[in-house]
A protein has these predicted regions:
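Short, mixed-charge low-complexity intrinsically disordered segments
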Residues: 3, 58-71
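Short aromatic-glycine-(Arg/Gly/Cys) micro-motifs in beta-strand/loop hairpins
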Residues: 16-35
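A short, charged, amphipathic alpha-helix used as a generic interaction element across diverse proteins
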Residues: 43-64
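A short, exposed loop/beta-hairpin motif centered on an aromatic-Gly-Thr core
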Residues: 33-45
Length: 71
């Protein structure tokens, strides 16, 4: 299992007629202790965070093997 957290900054706020643009920072816990930044257009900051974490998990799962700590 890949554990990750995210913070979201609003670039352009969402409105009832327009989706917003968000900057999402995602970081994982060891052995996937990387940080990634994504710019995501979504209906809300919550959805942007969920999409950012999903992208992060997909990237980490695509790695050939988990990184080894201390090397």
């Amino acid at each position: 299992m890949i554990l990750a957290s995210a913070t979201v900054d609003v670039i352009t706020p969402n409105t009832p007629k327009r989706i917003g643009n968000f900057r999402v920072e995602v970081w994982g816990k060891a052995p996937y202790d990387f940080v990634r930044h994504y710019e995501i257009m979504a209906q809300s900051d919550t959805i942007a965070a969920q999409q950012g974490i999903a992208r992060f998990v997909a990237e980490m799962e695509a790695m050939p093997e988990p990184p080894v700590q201390g090397s």
